[in-house]
C-alpha cells in the first residue's frame, strides 16, 4: 500500500514539474489581463474594442421645424 502511494506521489510531482516547465517561457502578464475594459463587465466610460476608429452616428435625426403631424403652417 505504501509503495503505491509513493508511486502515485512521484507521478503527481512529475506532472506538476512538467507543467511548470512548459510555462517557463512566459515571464510577463498579458496586458489584456490588467485592462478592466476588456473584462466581462467593463465599468462605465469604457468603449467597445476598436470604437475609436469608427465615425460617430447620431441616435436620431433632429429637425426643429414643422411636420405634418403638428399641423403647423408651411412656407410655400
From Swiss-Prot:
One of its GO terms (biological process) is regulation of growth. This is Protein RALF-like 26. One of its GO terms (molecular function) is hormone activity. It holds the Pfam family RALF. It is found in: Secreted. Disulfide bonds join 37-46, 66-72. Belongs to the plant rapid alkalinization factor (RALF) family.
